[in-house]
Design a protein with these regions (language model features):
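N-terminal signal peptide c-region/cleavage motif recognized by signal peptidases
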Residues: 21-23
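Beta-sheet-dominated interaction scaffolds and their linkers
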Residues: 25-49, 151-164
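Short, hydrophobic/aromatic beta-strand segments
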Residues: 54-62, 172, 179-184, 235
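Asparagine-centered strand-capping/turn motif at beta-strand->loop junctions
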Residues: 48-52, 169-175
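Short, basic/aromatic beta-hairpin or loop at an interaction surface
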Residues: 64-74, 181-185
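Terminal connector regions
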Residues: 100-149, 155, 215-240
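Intrinsically disordered, low-complexity Pro/Gly/Ser/Thr-rich segments with frequent PxxP/GP/PP motifs
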Residues: 70-103, 190-216
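Bacterial N-terminal signal peptides that target proteins for export
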Residues: 1-11
Length: 240
């Protein structure tokens, strides 16, 4: 990647968060909503498709949750190839992610984010010179899964323990796997309370604010978790 392209795409990365609030949609579609990277795998691949009508310049990279940091500054133990590619309409591109073998935590999963930034071609006609060129950014989770972790990721979400602390709900995750909760509904004394989506870290807990929270102990919670394949699974539990 030449220096000009590097600077241009870096600038677009910093601005893309603002673009995402506009009424438009991305043309690049990623196959899947998450990536699982088993430690024993040499690499993993991600497929992308351009479903728009124009060729697009696409940059791919990983971040560690700091989504506004210049990709050139992040020093992560992965290589993404190709980092920049052109994808024509109705065509696809496969991106390869390779772990560099730099040490990562071995007793639990590590979470990273796979980013795709698509840049449309510049308008050529005079009437379009002042048109706003939108760059779209898509992020999906990538879980690095060490070999030999205890338990089964397929059942981890169903084993969450729920407690109340003040006006917050505490989701306790005793497994070594991240749990992605799409939504949840608390039912207490016949009243239903909707809870926003959250990601519960492994061997830890997540504090979830609950507006106007009554006493929740003894109430029930129904929550939807996202599995390795992007599918959803419904679970029920009692709040202790």
């Amino acid at each position: 990647m030449d220096r000009f392209t590097q600077l241009t795409l870096t600038s677009l990365v910093c601005a893309s968060a603002a673009f995402s609030t506009l009424n438009a949609s991305a043309d690049i579609v990623i196959s899947g909503t998450r990536i699982i990277y088993p430690q024993s795998s040499k690499d993993v691949t991600v497929k992308m498709e351009n479903r728009g009508n124009n060729p697009l310049l696409v940059q791919s990279w990983l971040d560690d949750g700091r989504d506004t940091v210049n990709p050139q500054v992040l020093k992560l133990p992965f290589v993404v190839t190709p980092p920049v590619s052109r994808i024509d309409p109705s065509k696809g591109q496969t991106v390869r992610i390779t772990w560099t073998q730099q040490p990562l935590t071995q007793d639990r999963e590590s979470l990273f984010w796979f980013n795709v930034l698509e840049v449309p071609p510049k308008a050529k006609d005079a009437d379009s010179q002042n048109a706003l060129q939108l760059a779209f950014r898509t992020r999906i989770k990538m879980f690095f899964r060490p070999d030999g972790l205890q338990g089964d990721p397929a059942v981890a979400a169903g084993n969450l323990q729920w407690t109340q602390q003040g006006t917050a709900l505490i989701a306790n995750n005793s497994s070594p796997y991240y749990i992605s909760m799409a939504k949840a509904t608390i039912t207490v004394k016949g009243k239903k309370i909707e809870v926003d989506s959250h990601t519960i870290p492994p061997l830890s807990h997540e504090t979830i604010p609950v507006k106007n929270a009554p006493a929740l102990q003894g109430g029930g919670i129904e929550y939807i978790a996202i599995n390795d394949f992007g599918g959803t699974e419904k679970h029920q539990a009692t709040i202790n």
